[in-house]
Every structure is written in structure tokens, then in C-alpha cells.
Amino acid sequence: VTETAATGRALPHPDREHIRLESVLHALSDPMRLQIVRELAAKEAELTCSQFDLPVTKSTTTHHFRVLRESGVVRQVYRGTAKMNGLRRDDLESLFPGLLDSILAAADRQAARLGDAARVPVGG
């Protein structure tokens, strides 16, 4: 499935029925991508890529968002020139009940145990 905005640009996303558990777990296994998902879950809103203050290059940031999108964890759509990112919570909950909340809770416990050094702040 692709999303096309007025700009005519489209981004591929897996349909709900094509989201695979191993792809979701792989996407969430990277600390940077997990932090992106934690921030999206905390904000409960769409955020632009530039709102994430990640300590990596733009190309690496793009890679992380692509992995999250292609795994079905996030949906990216263009709104004008901005690429908006939203968590596909409903799709993930439908396919893997409780998985996302369990992972987010475990990540919160780990961040508390390891301190703020384990947290990647988001700008915004």
C-alpha cells in the first residue's frame, strides 16, 4: 500500500495483514528506533522527522524511519513538504495484542534502571 499526498510522492507501507512479527521485533531491537517509537507513543500524535533530535546523521535517521515504516510499526505520509510519522498502534494491537505496550513498558523500566543516558531526547 502507498500513501500519496498532493505532492504526488508515495511511500510504501505493508497492509495490516502483511505485517510480520519478526519484522516488528527487528525494527524495535535497535535502541534508536525504539526511542523513536517511545516518543511517538508518548506524544500520541504525528511528528515530523525533524522533530526528533537524534544524535545521528540525516541519512541514518532516514534509514531508521524506513525500517520502522517497512516493518509496519509507523506510517509515514507527506503533508506538504513535511514527512509525518505516526505509530500504527491499532494495526499492531490487532495483530499482536499487548506486544507494543509490553515493549514500551519494558523500555521505560530499562531507561529508569540505566538512567537518562539510555534516553534519546526528541525535539519539538
Language-model regions, residue ranges each:
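Generic signature of intrinsically disordered, low-complexity, basic-rich segments
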Residues: 1-3, 23, 58, 67, ...
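N-proximal short alpha-helices
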Residues: 5-10, 25, 34, 38-41, ...
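Low-complexity, charged, repeat-rich alpha-helical/coil interaction segments
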Residues: 16, 34-35, 62, 75, ...
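N-terminal helix-turn-helix DNA-binding core of bacterial DNA-binding proteins
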Residues: 22-57, 79-91
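Conserved acidic functional residues
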Residues: 30, 64, 97
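Canonical helix-turn-helix DNA-binding module
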Residues: 50-76
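A general structural signal for short secondary-structure boundary/capping elements
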Residues: 69-74, 83-86, 102
